C-alpha cells in the first residue's frame, strides 16, 4: 500500500490578473487529505476525479488501461467541499503521488501540476513553496523561497460554489479592473517572503480580497476589514472562487478568543458560523 497527503488551502493569498492571465498563490494550511492506494477492486463510492487521475498515470507510464480495475483508492479527508479550501486538489494530487509510489514511480512537482490541471483548475498547494501559479494550464510556476510564519482563523460559511461554476461567471472586465491592485499584491507577497514579514503578507492578501469583491463579493466585508483594523491583525484573505475567509494573525500575539467574540458581536457569525484556527504550512504532497 502507498499513502500520500496534501494540505488544504484557506482560499488564496492572492488571485487575479497578473502578467497577462489569471493566476493565484494558494494559502496551504494544516488540514490534510490522506489517500491510500492499494491492490484491490475500486470502491463503490470513490471520487470520479481520483479515478481519472489513476487512469491518466497509467497512460503517462504506458501501462495497460485495464490495470485500473486492480487499483483501489481510499480517501480520508474532512476538508470542507466546494467552499474554496482546495479539497479537490488535495484529493487528486495525493491520489497521484500515492498511485505513482504504488506503481514504483516518482512524480516531480511540475509533472504533478500538469496532470492535475488537465483534469480541473488546480490550487498551488501542490507545490512545497508558495507559488504563483496559472491554475488553468500550469504555464506559470514562480516559487517564493521562504514564507513568513502565520496562523489563520478560517471562517467557514454554509455557502458552496463549485470551482467549475465560478469559472462560468463572466469576469473578464472585473479581472482587468483589478490588475493594478494584483500587480502590487504580488510584489508584496514576494517582499513578505523575502523579509519573513507576516504584515506584508497580510497587506498583499487584503489587496487581493478587496479586488475580489468586484467578482465574488463576501457579505459584510467592510465589517471584516474594520475587525482586522481594530485587532491589529495581519490582514484578511478570501477564497476567490469559494466562500471561506481567513483572518491572518499570530495565535501567540493576538487574542483569538477576543476576535471570536467580536465576530459574534458584529453578527459576522451569521455568515460564517464555524471557525477553525489553523497554521499556514508548506505545501506539497508528502508520501507517508
Residue ranges and their predicted role:
Residues 83-109, 125:
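DPxDG-like acidic metal-binding loop motif
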